[in-house]
C-alpha cells in the first residue's frame, strides 16, 4: 500500500491487521533498492508513507512511482493506493502515477470510510451526512479538497478518463481503462464492489481504510482469522507514563484532548504556534517541562493553541514568508516531532507515545532513526497501535478528525498498561 501521510498508512495497515494479516508501516519514499523492506520481511502487508500530501502534484507522482518501482523490485505484486477520505492531497496525480508504475489499466476508486462517517453518495463525499465542502473538516490550514465530487477532484490532476458507477452492475465498459469512481454508504456497499470486481482482477484499488477493510475481509476469508480490536477498558495494575502530542488543529482532536485532560496524572504543556514558527519558543525549556512530568510518573500532553485568531496568524506568517497555506503547519509539526524525540531520548524509560497528525509522528520517528512501525493492536477502528521496528517504543497514530470524544483518553488508558500482550500477537 502507498499512502501520502503516516496516519493514512497506519490506519490502512490496521484494516488488514484486524483481519489476521501481519502489517507494517515504512517511512518513504523508498530508495531504489530499499533495505528497509528486509526489516519487515515477515509482514504480509506493507504500507509506505511517501509524505507527499503537500507536495506539488508532479513531484508527488514521481515519488509514488519510485516507491512502487522499489516495492516491485522487492517482490511486491499486489498494490493498493491509499487516498484521503476527504480528498486532501494529490489524489488524481498519485493514482495516475501508480497505475502506470504497477502496470494496471484501471483504478477503482472509493474514499468512503463509513466507520468514521465518510461516505460517497451520488459521486460526492459526505462527512456524517453533510456534503464535504460544507463540513468543518473542509477547512484545512494545509489545503483542503477542491470539490466534494470525487471525479471532479481527481480530474483536476489527471487526464485519464473518469467514469462513475452507483451500483456494481453499472461497471460494464468503464472497466477497460482509466478511473472508475464508485459509491458506498456502508461497509456492506464496499464489500459488494470487492465481490463484483474480485481479488484476482488486474485493477488498482484506491481508497481509504474503509475500502482497504473490505479487501482485507475478502483476503482473510482465504488465508487468516480476524483479530479482535482492543478494548481500552482492559484492566491492568501497571502504570506507565504516556506522552500525547496533539499536532492536529482539527476540532475533533481538540475535544478529545479536553476529555483526556480530565484523567488523573494528565498535564498540559501548551505552546504558542506562531511563537514556534518565529523561533521564539525554547525547545530546551519545553523538553525539560515534558521530561519533568514523565519522571514524576505523569502523562504529558503537548499541544499548541488552536483558536481562529491563531489560524489567521499562521496563514499570515506563511504569506509573509512567500509560502503556501501548509508551510507554518509543517514547521510546527517538525518542531513538535523534535520535542517528542528529545523527550524520548532524555527519559530512556519512556515507551509510550500518542500522536495526532501524521506529520508530527513522522517527524518524531525520523528524529529517532526509526524506519517504521509494526502494527500490534488497536484503540478503535482507524486508530492503530504500532511498535517501532528497531525498539520497544509503542506509538499510537490518529488522524485529526478520527475517533469519538474519548478516543485519546482510551488510548492513554490502554497504553499505560502492559503492552506485551499486543507485541506477541495475542491482541
Cite the ranges covered by each PLM segment:
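A structural-propensity feature for long, helix-poor, extended segments
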Residues: 41-51, 295-298, 387-422
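C-terminal structural cap/anchor segments
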Residues: 293, 297-356
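Cap/lid and interdomain-hinge subdomains that line or gate substrate/regulatory clefts
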Residues: 22-24, 44, 55-79, 83-197, ...
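Conserved, well-ordered active-site substructure
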Residues: 349-352, 356-410
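Conserved, well-structured core segments that form the ligand-binding/active-site neighborhood
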Residues: 126-289
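N-terminal basic/disordered segments at the start of proteins
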Residues: 1-42, 62, 110-115
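Short acidic, glycine/serine/threonine-rich loops at helix termini
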Residues: 12-14, 90-94, 118-126, 192-196, ...
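Glycine-rich, highly charged phosphate/nucleotide-binding loops
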Residues: 30-32, 37, 54-69, 332-335
Amino acid at each position: 500500500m502507498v499512502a501520502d501521510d503516516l496516519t493514512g498508512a497506519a490506519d490502512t495497515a490496521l484494516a488488514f491487521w484486524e483481519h489476521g494479516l501481519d502489517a507494517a508501516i515504512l517511512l518513504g519514499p523508498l530508495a531504489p533498492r530499499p533495505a528497509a523492506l528486509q526489516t519487515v520481511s515477515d509482514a504480509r502487508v506493507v504500507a509506505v508513507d511517501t509524505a507527499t500530501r503537500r507536495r506539488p502534484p508532479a513531484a508527488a507522482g514521481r515519488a509514488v512511482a519510485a516507491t512502487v518501482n522499489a516495492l516491485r523490485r522487492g517482490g511486491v505484486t499486489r498494490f493498493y493506493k491509499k487516498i484521503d477520505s476527504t480528498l486532501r492531497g494529490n489524489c488524481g496525480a498519485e493514482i495516475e502515477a501508480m497505475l502506470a508504475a504497477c502496470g494496471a489499466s484501471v483504478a477503482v476508486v472509493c474514499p468512503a470510510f463509513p466507520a468514521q462517517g465518510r461516505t460517497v453518495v451520488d459521486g460526492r463525499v459526505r462527512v456524517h451526512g453533510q456534503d464535504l465542502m460544507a463540513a468543518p473538516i473542509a477547512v484545512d490550514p494545509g489545503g483542503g479538497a477542491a470539490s466534494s465530487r470525487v471525479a471532479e477532484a481527481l480530474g483536476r490532476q489527471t487526464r485519464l478518463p473518469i467514469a462513475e458507477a452507483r451500483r456494481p452492475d453499472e461497471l460494464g465498459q468503464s472497466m477497460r481503462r482509466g478511473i472508475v469512481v464508485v459509491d458506498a454508504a456502508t461497509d456492506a456497499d464496499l464489500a459488494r464492489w470487492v465481490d463484483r470486481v474480485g481479488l484476482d482482477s488486474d485493477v488498482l484499488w484506491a481508497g481509504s481504510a474503509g475500502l482497504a477493510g473490505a479487501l482485507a475481509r475478502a483476503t482473510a476469508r482465504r488465508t487468516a482469522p480476524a483479530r479482535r480490536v482492543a478494548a481500552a477498558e482492559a484492566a491492568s495494575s501497571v502504570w506507565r507514563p504516556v506522552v500525547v502530542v496533539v499536532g492536529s488543529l482539527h476540532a475533533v482532536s481538540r475535544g478529545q484532548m479536553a476529555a483526556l485532560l480530565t484523567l488523573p496524572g494528565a498535564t498540559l504543556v501548551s505552546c504558542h504556534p506562531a511563537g514556534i514558527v518565529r523561533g521564539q519558543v525554547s525547545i530546551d525549556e519545553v523538553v525539560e517541562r515534558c521530561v519533568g512530568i514523565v519522571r514524576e510518573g505523569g502523562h504529558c500532553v503537548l499541544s499548541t493553541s488552536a483558536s481562529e485568531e491563531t489560524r489567521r496568524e499562521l496563514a499570515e506568517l506563511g504569506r509573509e514568508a512567500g509560502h503556501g497555506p501548509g508551510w507554518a503547519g509543517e514547521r510546527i509539526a517538525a518542531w513538535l516531532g523534535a520535542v517528542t524525540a528529545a523527550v524520548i531520548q532524555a527519559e530512556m524509560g519512556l515507551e509510550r507515545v500518542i500522536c495526532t497528525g501524521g506529520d508530527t509522528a513522522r517527524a518524531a520517528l525520523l528524529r529517532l532513526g526509526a524506519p517504521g512501525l509494526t502494527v500490534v493492536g488497536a484503540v478503535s477502528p482507524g486508530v492503530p497501535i504500532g511498535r517501532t521496528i528497531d525498539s520497544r517504543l509503542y506509538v499510537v497514530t490518529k488522524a485529526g478528525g478520527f475517533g469519538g470524544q474519548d478516543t485519546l483518553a482510551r488510548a492513554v488508558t490502554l497504553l499505560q498498561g502492559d503492552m506485551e500482550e499486543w507485541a506477541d500477537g495475542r491482541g
